[in-house]
């Protein structure tokens, strides 16, 4: 069974000033996610699913989905603020889409096989997809609720144009992820990688500290498990269920 690539593409692009997921940057107008999809296909992925917003469906079908017809199965699902599990409601005044868990939940009726989740607007490298594809392909038959995350060395994910947001990770001796705390301001200061903590102080970390760039593989049984049926907070995440990490050197940061 070939794994599926799930691309999170419902962002509003408020800082960028538009739908950067649709903007071409390659010599033939390729988008960032086109490169990820190509590398994932080379790594053995057999289907792609996009999570988008309904309001730009027509643009997305024309600019993105149409180019994959006849090459690989591709489907859309839609993230909406009010599409919430029972007992949840949208806070007054909220317009920003929910986080990763909610986006993944939107694909619950489409994905029935092992899958990998990525951001559509981050550039990864082929090694990333080879690593995660290998993990999924080597899981024993009948595996249930298995997860992994590709860790990148933070020093390789920085930008020359300002701070970046990354999940600072820690792991145990068996390579299990123990914590992942999102830091929204990371940059190099006086030659050292540093992030700003809750008190506004800069904290230095080693260049090889593993960080999350939102690349994770999921093998869920049932396909979307009950713990995922909750919106996820965007500020801080802590691993409640340890999972293995795999490490790659990492691409340039956005």
Model-derived features: positions:
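A C-terminal functional module that forms or caps the active site or interfaces directly
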Residues: 229-254
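Conserved beta strand-loop-helix elements of the APE1-like EEP
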Residues: 214-224
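Conserved core of the sugar-phosphate nucleotidyltransferase
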Residues: 126-216
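Active-site flanking residues adjacent to catalytic metal/cofactor-binding acidic residues
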Residues: 118-121, 152
